[in-house]
A protein has these predicted regions:
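Glycine-enriched alpha-helix->loop->beta-strand junction motifs that scaffold or abut catalytic
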Residues: 34-39, 62-69, 97-101, 120-127, ...
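Histidine/acidic-residue-rich catalytic or RNA/ligand-binding cores of hydrolases
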Residues: 82-90, 113-122, 138-146, 162-174
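His/Asp/Glu-enriched short active-site or ligand-binding loop at hydrolase and phosphoryl-transfer sites
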Residues: 126-137
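Mid-to-C-terminal alpha-helical segments outside catalytic/metal-binding sites
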Residues: 26-30, 150-155, 163-196
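Short acidic/histidine-rich active-site segments
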Residues: 107, 129-131, 145-166
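Active-site gating/metal-coordination segments in enzymes
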Residues: 1-72, 76-85, 122, 136
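Conserved, mostly hydrophobic/aromatic
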Residues: 3, 31, 40, 63, ...
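Structural detector of well-ordered beta-strand residues that form the stable sheet scaffold
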Residues: 11-13, 71, 104, 127-129, ...
Length: 196
């Protein structure tokens, strides 16, 4: 409803039932083709399965066919459940298996953020978003990556309503990004990856 009413403000990401991957493929295809959704979002810990589980693979292949990214949570979980599903090493496997798949890794990858940065640097199809973290909590290694070789690889995110965009944007000056990097971080990287 929000997407239909405010198409200049909102875009959709599809979700999928991993227990029925082929039904999920059909739903993903429908939402991308009929409703202009821009990607697939899967929170691995909800399913207690890492993204390397075979149930993901039909959906990942369909993302490649539709040329939309998959957005995954990478890092420790907030709820009291295992964080093993969000370890960055799983991203390496799917990046190798699906080199054409755009993979957006949410939540920075903390506490394994340095490993996450290595994979974003290593694979042209792997990206990081900063959702669930305010700028003052970004690890120094991530800020250095944004300012350097990773300026085309990291996207601003908030995980709204957990964090309010305005509150995160107020802290942006802490990062001391130049104008070009700020534009990439806040806008251009997401525009390119999600084809906005």
């Amino acid at each position: 409803d929000c997407i239909d009413r405010y198409p200049d403000l909102f875009v959709g990401l599809a979700s999928a039932d991993l227990s029925k991957p082929m039904e999920g493929v059909r739903e993903l295809r429908k939402y991308v083709k009929e409703h202009d959704f821009k990607g697939l979002r899967i929170v691995q810990w909800l399913w207690d399965k890492p993204c390397t589980d075979p149930l993901y693979y039909p959906l990942l292949a369909e993302c490649v066919e539709l040329d939309v990214p998959v957005c995954l949570q990478v890092g420790i979980t907030g709820p009291l459940c295992t964080s093993r599903t969000g370890q960055p090493s799983h991203i390496e496997r799917i990046a190798l298996d699906f080199p054409e798949l755009k993979i957006v890794c949410g939540h920075i990858g903390a506490p394994w953020h340095e490993e996450m940065i290595v994979y974003a640097r290593k694979f042209p199809n792997v990206y990081i978003d900063t959702s669930a973290y305010v700028p003052k909590r970004y690890p120094k290694a991530l800020v250095d990556f944004i300012k350097g070789s990773g300026k085309h690889k990291v996207m601003f995110g908030t995980n709204f309503p957990m964090l309010m965009p305005a509150d995160c944007l107020k802290q942006l000056d802490i990062l001391e990004l130049d104008e070009e990097t700020t534009q990439l971080f806040l806008h251009d990287n997401a525009k390119r990856v999600f084809k906005l």
